[in-house]
Amino acid sequence: MQEIIEAVDRKLLEQELTPDKFVKRTNSGNNEIYIVTCHNSPNITREIGRLREITFRDAGGGTGLACDLDEFDLDKDTPFQQLFVWDPREKEIIGGYRFIHGKTLKRHKDGHIDTPTSELFHLSDTFIEDYLPHTIELGRSFVQPNYQPTVNLRRGMFALDNIWNG
């Protein structure tokens, strides 16, 4: 098992929190929701990967790598987008999930769609053609340990609700 990477400098994270990535304020807690990719926010993406690995290891899982980022997060053409909740007071990422619109998924010459779901299930041609373009694949959702109710009730009270606001 690899040692988890160091936290990304908060100043670097804040520099990437630009208005074009801002979605909205949360309904509870006055936190902020953003959407980024590895291309427009490499530091935030790295911190998300670090926090996911910490969170999943804490729950008995994890990749065992230094940072939980894979080919879907880092794709050069159409990476998954990262929706996350930012706590502006503590300057921390609370949690989030990655997603991709089904219509942006590319079909290989052999008909295979490259997505985490296709690694778990056989996607029929009918599903790929008629339904997939109207879907959004969500995955790797997490609430980092410092915002889970079992660790900090005050912080954790609305953490998951804040993510669902997105």
Question: Each predicted region: which residue ranges?
Answer:
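Short, well-ordered loop/turn elements at secondary-structure boundaries
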Residues: 78-81, 89, 93-94, 131-133, ...
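Conserved N-terminal entry element of GNAT/NAT acetyltransferase domains
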Residues: 2-39
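Acyl-donor binding region in acyl/amide transferases
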Residues: 104-166
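Generic detection of long, well-ordered alpha-helical segments
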Residues: 3, 7, 38-49, 157-161
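A short helix-loop-beta-strand connector motif used in the catalytic cores of GNAT acetyltransferases and
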Residues: 73-84, 107
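Intrinsically disordered, low-complexity boundary segments flanking structured domains
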Residues: 16-23, 69, 121-129
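Acetyl-CoA-dependent GNAT
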Residues: 99-103
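Short amphipathic alpha-helix that is part of the acyltransferase structural core
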Residues: 25-71, 82-98
